[in-house]
């Protein structure tokens, strides 16, 4: 069985990690260092 605390930590970490990656990619895109030609 998965512990409720561990399950909560995982469910809380996944969105934060995705948000962090999105923000990092957005910052690179705004700097013009993106391969998308922005």
Swiss-Prot record:
Segments traversing the membrane: 5-25
Coiled coil: none
Membrane topology value: Single-pass membrane protein
Name of this protein: Cytochrome b6-f complex subunit 5
Quaternary structure (record): The 4 large subunits of the cytochrome b6-f complex are cytochrome b6, subunit IV (17 kDa polypeptide, PetD), cytochrome f and the Rieske protein, while the 4 small subunits are PetG, PetL, PetM and PetN. The complex functions as a dimer.
Protein's organism: Parasynechococcus marenigrum (strain WH8102)
Gene Ontology cellular-component annotations: cytochrome b6f complex; plasma membrane-derived thylakoid membrane
Pfam families per the UniProt record, alphabetical: PetG (PF02529)
Location, primary (coarse class): membrane
UniProt record similarity statement: Belongs to the PetG family.
Keywords: Electron transport, Membrane, Photosynthesis, Thylakoid, Transmembrane, Transmembrane helix, Transport
């Amino acid at each position: 069985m998965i512990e409720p605390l561990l399950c909560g930590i995982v469910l809380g970490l996944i969105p934060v990690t995705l948000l962090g990656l999105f923000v990092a990619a957005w910052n690179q895109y705004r700097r013009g260092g993106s391969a998308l030609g922005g």
